[in-house]
Amino acid sequence: MGIGVAVATWVCAKLDDMKTVTDETFFAEVPLFSEFEGVTDAANYRPLPDGWVLALADIVGSTPAIAAGRYKDVNMAGASVISAVLNSVGKGDYPFVFGGDGALIALPGSLEKAARDALAAVQVWVEEDLGLTLRIAIVPVADTRAEGLDVRVARYSASPYVTYAMFWGGGTSWAERQMKLGRYGIDRAAPGTRPDLTGLSCRWSPIDARHGEVVSIIAVPGEGRPGQEFRDLVNGIVSITTEQNRDSHPVPADGPNLAFSLHGINREAKATAPAGRRLRQKLIIFLQLAITVVCYKLGIPLGRFDARRYKRDVAGNSDFRKFDDGLKMTIDVDAEHLKRIETLLEAARAKGIARYGLHRQASALMTCFVPTPISRDHMHFIDGAAGGYAVAASRMTGKVLATAPHQT
């Protein structure tokens, strides 16, 4: 009897070990696709493992902040969620999506406690340092499946160095709705609690449109789950964007101009250093920028850091288009191509195939997560500079947000 119990215990332990390895390597083992049209191919998606959770956050009542031109702060709050959670779990390779005024990260259940603590900490930081209110939640994937939905993930290769998660199945949208209803909440952290925001950066100035306007677009299925007609809509929009240079990418191929935002540098210093060390952090940032500019102008690397290569990688590693139970993209598009996109969207809306929101602005914003500038896997989150996805979403739901002024 004792031997049988021992054997059973050993087998269970081995199975637990195997499960841990599977959880840790799950996303890395999802097959890559490199043509964005693949977001509509169900064969590219894999269901999240049982026992996983969704860590979610978004800004509550972003209207006043957008009207005041503080969308860079809103974007930074959204990106800080990704930075805080990934740093709390050792920067593992887990699926996430940036939504402009919020974010979602999928994690194994074994990391739920770390994610809860990180979300609670970033909520306090956003409130105390940015003056914004962040709503947070942890939703079990099993609960989405109990509703007849699913959370399936695909892995899109934006460049040879960075992949981004695409989500399909209705589960993430359901989880977001539950969060906004006040369910699956997380206890508040103590005042003064600070998350680990190492790598969070927002130094770049807004990136002006070169072809016409920077347009943020959201399109989601009209009723029920997306069918072939919705897939055709997404493919049609993507096809139009590919007719322009670099698929209507809002960031130039050789990277953004070497223009930096003083306001953004101040934000970054507040995010990555405690109150007593922020002046020192600003000086470090200015020194890093000076070195980057000199190395770029002279075309010489500094050790393993190559400024010209880094700037090109910024463009290649940017997430200007994504799929999260619907299409989201921020593109640089001319009037003729935009008109064709709007025609497709309006026809789909009239037929009940899709709901959509669209917002035009003069430039794009970029908020970054750079674990180390030496490595080439730095990530850059793109949104419109004057309200972006938040304003597009408001137009989809029928709410009215004030037009945001140009932000620096």
Language model feature labels by segment:
Residues 2-408:
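Regulatory and interdomain segments flanking nucleotide-handling catalytic cores
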